[in-house]
Amino acid sequence: MSSGSKEGGGGSPAYHLPHPHPHPPQHAQYVGPYRLEKTLGKGQTGLVKLGVHCITGQKVAVKIVNREKLSESVLMKVEREIAILKLIEHPHVLKLHDVYENKKYLYLVLEHVSGGELFDYLVKKGRLTPKEARKFFRQIVSALDFCHSYSICHRDLKPENLLLDEKNNIRIADFGMASLQVGDSLLETSCGSPHYACPEVIKGEKYDGRRADMWSCGVILFALLVGALPFDDDNLRQLLEKVKRGVFHMPHFIPPDCQSLLRGMIEVEPEKRLSLEQIQKHPWYLGGKHEPDPCLEPAPGRRVAMRSLPSNGELDPDVLESMASLGCFRDRERLHRELRSEEENQEKMIYYLLLDRKERYPSCEDQDLPPRNDVDPPRKRVDSPMLSRHGKRRPERKSMEVLSITDAGSGGSPVPTRRALEMAQHSQRSRSVSGASTGLSSSPLSSPRSPVFSFSPEPGVGDEARGGGSPTSKTQTLPSRGPRGGGAGEQPPPPSARSTPLPGPPGSPRSSGGTPLHSPLHTPRASPTGTPGTTPPPSPGGGVGGAAWRSRLNSIRNSFLGSPRFHRRKMQVPTAEEMSSLTPESSPELAKRSWFGNFISLDKEEQIFLVLKDKPLSSIKADIVHAFLSIPSLSHSVLSQTSFRAEYKASGGPSVFQKPVRFQVDISSSEGPEPSPRRDGSSGGGIYSVTFTLISGPSRRFKRVVETIQAQLLSTHDQPSVQALADEKNGAQTRPAGTPPRSLQPPPGRPDPDLSSSPRRGPSKDKKLLATNGTPLP
């Protein structure tokens, strides 16, 4: 019998299994030669889908950025990330292949890796052995050393931004917060994730990005060895205070030499903190030298020679455009002057690194593309007519996209037609609040997943102080590139979307916007049509000024929270009594414009209200108690005649996700007519409001518990939530209708949908690992 058929008795026909590819997909979406398939993840700046080359079958991760849904600042960070990824070619850094675009979308074709996030790996395995932790740590340090050698600071290192390939080797992703730190200048933008951010960043002080990365590396190493974070608290203000003090418990099972390394990296004083060079000479780091790691072997280098350029006419327009996206070379006259200088400087190093990348991997137009009928198909960003190192112009490619023009208003600097068209269209772009609403991640998974926060409006990386270029050697060595990958997302809009709003120029200033949230820290939900984004709620005042205030507030919150998949924690707000006891004298940081400190005052409690009519108070109280008793693993206590305190804790699943939900239930009489007496003489039911207030724990689980209680109070016979909670107690995972197929980030395709929109990945008392904002997951 053939494996492809099934015989039936009595002359019944054979049933053939369907052919795996009976016919090509009717509505297949293409980005260049890549056919878009399943969604891999969702980040702050875009969705990520799996792309498969239509001829070679090569897999890539395609990040889809909706330019109409993101603020100009976020789009500018995407352009900056593109430029930075062009600078970095290292075996442990995620690689950028190509960039495509049309009027509405930007498509980043990234390396695809199949091992997922280091965070998920750590949650699954628990704390790692010192040997395995050292392997990961050495790969991270190797990649960081390469980045820092070219003045690139990541600024958002955390296990969620570290991907694993099929051989469990590290790929650093999400350079959305990365910045060039030129010369001896310091950075000013407070960005990152509070659990991994260093004290000087939290305080809002100027800081050295390289030393900030070292602190984050120390926290990551601690998490690898312990399975928990050194600083953690359900209350955001308390968490930030712990980070500023820098006091943490060192478990006894960590090897003594590794303990000294951790204390040297997680050091409050930046000047005393270990540098990369000191880390690489540390005994514990060197202890792994006998452990072979082919990925750490130095790859064959490529020497990049620098020379002076006698005239502006020899400057490559594509390279200049990439340098402008970096944000620290805005003074065009100074940039041209430094490039023409005979002295060695940072500008020339960056210029020739980008030029070398362009010459070795030229971006040409695709050949033999599949036939498409898209109205506005994605077009590849191809090179402009390129100058050789000897000033001779190379043959021009046959494409309208590769022509260059001279921008008379910018001193005659060459500007590619693509960028010039975008600048011409920018003046027509709508600047409504809803037009800049959605913020997805900036990591290649999402991410790139992370926005940079700033209180004062600053374009791009304008917060970085521009210092004089430090001398650099005339030759730079670039390692040959190796295999890489990564990606994660949600159902993206089709590349052929007919929407015609014109995009703004990626290089133009943009607000540091993000995703407007329906409540202070609620998770943004995908719209029914799959478009990633939501419309912000009206401002309290309802006026234009209020809308602007609301937009700015949402931008601030989103900038702090970063990627939706890991930053959904319901932060606790300090009480009025606590805040009244704090003064600039008792806490000097309150007087500073630190984004961490200011964010606290913007948060509010999470509450759910239920109005009940024609039910007496005694009946409502009885129904609430009955609902409490019907939910497994829920305990309650009576605070007063009309108040209850409840706690729900699931007993199934890994201990790392057993964060209890604590909430309070208050019953109050609403305004309304006096209840009329019943025929039997008892008073009739009035109008009562039942308020459920989350005290601590995962927001998503809190909502599910409240839905179950509401079903009881409304006398609903169909109560699927009760069964869901029971399944959860037994370790089963459920996915509510409409929940995107994502987990922890919520990366789609992950098996645990219950975590997809949980506010926090979080822990039990003895073993817990927290995501960037420390929000515990169920």
From Swiss-Prot:
<dbReference type="GO" id="GO:0005524">
    <property type="term" value="F:ATP binding"/>
</dbReference>
<comment type="function">
    <text>Serine/threonine-protein kinase that plays a key role in polarization of neurons and centrosome duplication. Phosphorylates CDC25B, CDC25C, MAPT/TAU, RIMS1, TUBG1, TUBG2 and WEE1. Following phosphorylation and activation by STK11/LKB1, acts as a key regulator of polarization of cortical neurons, probably by mediating phosphorylation of microtubule-associated proteins such as MAPT/TAU at 'Thr-523' and 'Ser-573'. Also regulates neuron polarization by mediating phosphorylation of WEE1 at 'Ser-642' in postmitotic neurons, leading to down-regulate WEE1 activity in polarized neurons.</text>
</comment>
<dbReference type="GO" id="GO:0106310">
    <property type="term" value="F:protein serine kinase activity"/>
</dbReference>
<dbReference type="GO" id="GO:0021953">
    <property type="term" value="P:central nervous system neuron differentiation"/>
</dbReference>
<feature type="modified residue" description="Phosphothreonine; by LKB1">
    <location>
        <position position="189"/>
    </location>
</feature>
<keyword id="KW-0547">Nucleotide-binding</keyword>
<feature type="region of interest" description="Disordered">
    <location>
        <begin position="362"/>
        <end position="548"/>
    </location>
</feature>
<dbReference type="GO" id="GO:0014069">
    <property type="term" value="C:postsynaptic density"/>
</dbReference>
<dbReference type="GO" id="GO:0099504">
    <property type="term" value="P:synaptic vesicle cycle"/>
</dbReference>
<feature type="modified residue" description="Phosphoserine">
    <location>
        <position position="443"/>
    </location>
</feature>
<keyword id="KW-0770">Synapse</keyword>
<feature type="modified residue" description="Phosphoserine">
    <location>
        <position position="450"/>
    </location>
</feature>
<keyword id="KW-0597">Phosphoprotein</keyword>
<dbReference type="GO" id="GO:0008306">
    <property type="term" value="P:associative learning"/>
</dbReference>
<feature type="binding site">
    <location>
        <position position="63"/>
    </location>
    <ligand>
        <name>ATP</name>
    </ligand>
</feature>
<keyword id="KW-0524">Neurogenesis</keyword>
<feature type="active site" description="Proton acceptor">
    <location>
        <position position="156"/>
    </location>
</feature>
<keyword id="KW-0227">DNA damage</keyword>
<dbReference type="GO" id="GO:0008021">
    <property type="term" value="C:synaptic vesicle"/>
</dbReference>
<feature type="modified residue" description="Phosphoserine">
    <location>
        <position position="193"/>
    </location>
</feature>
<feature type="modified residue" description="Phosphothreonine">
    <location>
        <position position="583"/>
    </location>
</feature>
<dbReference type="GO" id="GO:0030182">
    <property type="term" value="P:neuron differentiation"/>
</dbReference>
<dbReference type="InterPro" id="IPR015940">
    <property type="entry name" value="UBA"/>
</dbReference>
<feature type="modified residue" description="Omega-N-methylarginine">
    <location>
        <position position="525"/>
    </location>
</feature>
<feature type="modified residue" description="Phosphothreonine">
    <location>
        <position position="529"/>
    </location>
</feature>
<dbReference type="GO" id="GO:0048812">
    <property type="term" value="P:neuron projection morphogenesis"/>
</dbReference>
<feature type="region of interest" description="Disordered">
    <location>
        <begin position="719"/>
        <end position="778"/>
    </location>
</feature>
<feature type="compositionally biased region" description="Basic and acidic residues">
    <location>
        <begin position="362"/>
        <end position="383"/>
    </location>
</feature>
<dbReference type="GO" id="GO:0030010">
    <property type="term" value="P:establishment of cell polarity"/>
</dbReference>
<keyword id="KW-0460">Magnesium</keyword>
<dbReference type="GO" id="GO:0050321">
    <property type="term" value="F:tau-protein kinase activity"/>
</dbReference>
<dbReference type="InterPro" id="IPR048622">
    <property type="entry name" value="BRSK1_2-like_UBA"/>
</dbReference>
<dbReference type="GO" id="GO:0004674">
    <property type="term" value="F:protein serine/threonine kinase activity"/>
</dbReference>
<feature type="modified residue" description="Phosphothreonine">
    <location>
        <position position="535"/>
    </location>
</feature>
<dbReference type="GO" id="GO:0046777">
    <property type="term" value="P:protein autophosphorylation"/>
</dbReference>
<feature type="modified residue" description="Omega-N-methylarginine">
    <location>
        <position position="466"/>
    </location>
</feature>
<keyword id="KW-0479">Metal-binding</keyword>
<dbReference type="GO" id="GO:0005813">
    <property type="term" value="C:centrosome"/>
</dbReference>
<comment type="similarity">
    <text>Belongs to the protein kinase superfamily. CAMK Ser/Thr protein kinase family. SNF1 subfamily.</text>
</comment>
<dbReference type="GO" id="GO:0007409">
    <property type="term" value="P:axonogenesis"/>
</dbReference>
<feature type="modified residue" description="Omega-N-methylarginine">
    <location>
        <position position="498"/>
    </location>
</feature>
<feature type="binding site">
    <location>
        <begin position="40"/>
        <end position="48"/>
    </location>
    <ligand>
        <name>ATP</name>
    </ligand>
</feature>
